[in-house]
Amino acid sequence: MEGAADQTTKALSELAMDSSTTLNAAESSAGDGAGPRSKNALKKEQKMKQKEEEKRRKDEEKAEKAKQAPKASSQKAVAADDEEMDATQYYENRLKYLAAEKAKGENPYPHKFAVSMSIPKYIETYGSLNNGDHVENAEESLAGRIMSKRSSSSKLFFYDLHGDDFKVQVMADASKSGLDEAEFLKLHSNAKRGDIVGVIGFPGKTKRGELSIFPRSFILLSHCLHMMPRKADNVNAKKPEIWVPGQTRNPEAYVLKDQESRYRQRHLDMILNVEVRQIFRTRAKIISYVRRFLDNKNFLEVETPMMNMIAGGAAARPFVTHHNDLDMRLYMRIAPELYLKQLIVGGLERVYEIGKQFRNEGIDLTHNPEFTTCEFYMAFADYNDLMEMTEVMLSGMVKELTGGYKIKYNANGYDKDPIEIDFTPPFRRIEMIGELEKVAKLNIPKDLASEEANKYLIDACARFDVKCPPPQTTARLLDKLVGEFLEPTCVNPTFIINQPEIMSPLAKWHRSKSGLTERFELFINKHELCNAYTELNDPVVQRQRFADQLKDRQSGDDEAMALDETFCNALEYGLAPTGGWGLGIDRLSMLLTDSLNIKEVLFFPAMRPPQEESAAAQAPLTEEKK
């Protein structure tokens, strides 16, 4: 550039000499009788020549910069082609870019970026601007993930910036960036879909009314190294409606559709499918509502052990572990019930716990080995009080989350018409034994603990082709028949009440119906959501019930309850008349989010390992691995 400056100085000197010569020639020609030229004309001519020389100098400087910087056309081609390349090559290119930045002493992962407001707040604050308005005296800083990138030239880039389930347009203009064209193009060529960026600029709306932020500073904060799936373009597709709890949804419209990929890579599922984030927000609201409901009724939230010496409180197969220091076998809890009732004995009259339970059983559309429940225990209450509380809690929750008592649910698949489920209280109530006899036209012996009753139920299952694998205990046979004849009728919320004692070892006997208990199960959409009863508080009867369960266990029913001596001892100190209640949080979340698979409402559901991992896990251990 110094050579160019010297040339400019020389040219200006020559121009001055030319001007002097021209002036002398004009004076000479005047003496010779030619027409005189004015001094003003000569000055104008001199200025024009100076402007031409200045323009030439600037053009030379631009040409010099163009040689030093990559050509805009080639960079645009790279930006356009990088998402067309092989995914592995794309990943390797991104790694090379980061390595190059680090080699130059740059930190591609800044420690901090100060955000002035969230994207939803930005939309709320500036959404009322008129089309074409810019507020250049206001400065805001936003951060989020780039979900869409497009450009109209090397000097103008557009981004969709997503955060907190909302998006705003970023309109990056080279003329407002404080960078020269080459630096601007390099920065925005390296910004990719999926990257997290910080933007500092002023708010405004485009002429078409798109709320945007116009950055003066654009900072790459974190980099997405993988090529993200993108939704196929469909010019005829309607803009999807915003999903709300209680309404149907369509996972087939998701960007990432494959269930295996979605459940194994939940982070990617949530990045690409906005609705998935809403599902988990709804689940959190359900838990929050339950907690608030019980807190308002003066319940105390407590925590009880998740590892126990005895797997009690429910009829289920436990997970077994080992405590090395104590050298003893422990069981992951299948229910917190027995501990919570001991707290009632201790004088805490209303307690509840929301937490994980673990059952080593099958995995299907409504069962996961690790699941979440809420259990509460209320002194001086019975199962009638709990039915009323259940109606108030669930109907109130549905109304708060959806705006009404009725929800839509794709019970028969997303390709079929949805059903309507009505949570308007009061809920339907049916007697288990009486309704079963009525629907299946049975006449079950009254003494359900007798051999006669067991044989009758075995014959009934055979007659209706209801499968009940061994051991064919009376409790298991009844459960299978109820699943065949009663549960399918329970679409709207329905209480199945007054279960037999042989099916309810922890429930109190019915005060007027021999052989039955004061218990209910709430079914919705043919699945159990709640289980509750008036608690058995007679320690002598409780020991006898545990003894009966032991007989079932000895006959092969490994889900039968074991005797918990500590619990029985606590009952001997006196348990007040108490009502106990349990709710399956996961299944309720499924209903209110139109989810047909329990994995949809669990961030990280239980999955079989991928085939290659499974093969490695099952391979014999070598001495080195041992």
Curated annotation (Swiss-Prot):
Biased composition (Low complexity): 69-78
Catalytic activity: tRNA(Lys) + L-lysine + ATP = L-lysyl-tRNA(Lys) + AMP + diphosphate
UniProt-annotated location(s): Cytoplasm, Cytosol
GO annotations of cellular component type: cytosol; plasmodesma
E.C. designation(s): 6.1.1.6
Alphabetical UniProt keywords: Acetylation, Aminoacyl-tRNA synthetase, ATP-binding, Calcium, Coiled coil, Cytoplasm, DNA-binding, Ligase, Metal-binding, Nucleotide-binding, Protein biosynthesis
Binding residues for ATP: R359, N360, E361, H367, N368, E528, L529, G584, I585, D586, R587
Taxonomic superkingdom: Eukaryota
Cofactor(s) for this UniProt protein: Ca(2+)
Residues the record lists as binding Ca(2+): E521, E528
GO MF terms, alphabetically ordered: ATP binding; DNA binding; lysine-tRNA ligase activity; metal ion binding
Coiled-coil regions listed in the entry: 37-69
Modified residues (N-acetylmethionine): M1
Family to which this protein belongs: Belongs to the class-II aminoacyl-tRNA synthetase family.
Protein known as: Lysine--tRNA ligase, cytoplasmic
Organism, scientific name: Arabidopsis thaliana
